[in-house]
Amino acid sequence: MDEAGTAAFRPGCTVSKIETDAATPVRALLQVSGLTKWYGDEIALADVAFDVNVREVLGVIGPNGAGKTTLLEAVAGLQPVDTGNITWRGAPLPRARRREFIFYLPDGIRPYQDQSVARVLAFFAGVYRRSGAHVAEIVAALGLGSVLAKRVHALSKGFNRRLLLALALIAPHPLVLMDEPFDGFDLRQSRAIGDLLRRIAQDGRALVLAIHQLGDAERVCDRFILLSGGRLRGQGTLTALRQRTGLPAASLEEVFLALT
């Protein structure tokens, strides 16, 4: 099966264990500190720091060009950075080992586009030793049954996004990074996908979602990091961000505008 898309999407990495100091309890699953990335003379990320906790949905919020995709790619190990540290449960996580723990779902790729949806799902299920019943449950949850025989290149944007979400569900990685997971869905579909993402987190995984639809973000995410011009402008729950801005009834959009 030929691969189309990005190296981040290449399956086959089993989830590993990384040595930690058992005497020191660590709540955060992933810790990012001092992450800085330059493109020539242009700053893409400036000293970005945040944590991701188990069973948490963290929203990365910002306009186009804010650095959201660059941040996800840097955390996933696809982008080298100039400075910064990433740890997993308190232990350093080298770039070469990120794929063992982190599944990155880019925006807009079409994986294995000359293959049928059914074959792509079966391939991923085989790689990660998932049962047919498990895959059938995912297919039903995402409404993919009607397109199983279609080739990936023939899928609409919405169905391609559903396929990508299905592959993220099949993969066992404890941390999933998603770039614009609601892109291509109408309001009803976005709500259903949001509910599904919440269930994924509640089942013990952590999600980091780069989102520009602030209504979806406000409904789905537990905490937020606000990016503008590659710089972290604020982070925390919506309640905490409201307190920081002195706007007790503000929406996420109003908080973002106040801080940027």
PLM regions and their residue ranges:
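Helix-to-loop junction immediately C-terminal to a conserved catalytic motif
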Residues: 76
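Conserved ABC transporter NBD signature motif
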Residues: 84-98
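Conserved ABC ATPase "signature" region
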Residues: 122, 126, 132-148
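Catalytic Walker B motif of ABC-type/P-loop ATPase nucleotide-binding domains
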Residues: 176-180
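A short, surface-exposed alpha-helical micro-motif characterized by mixed small hydrophobic
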Residues: 217-219
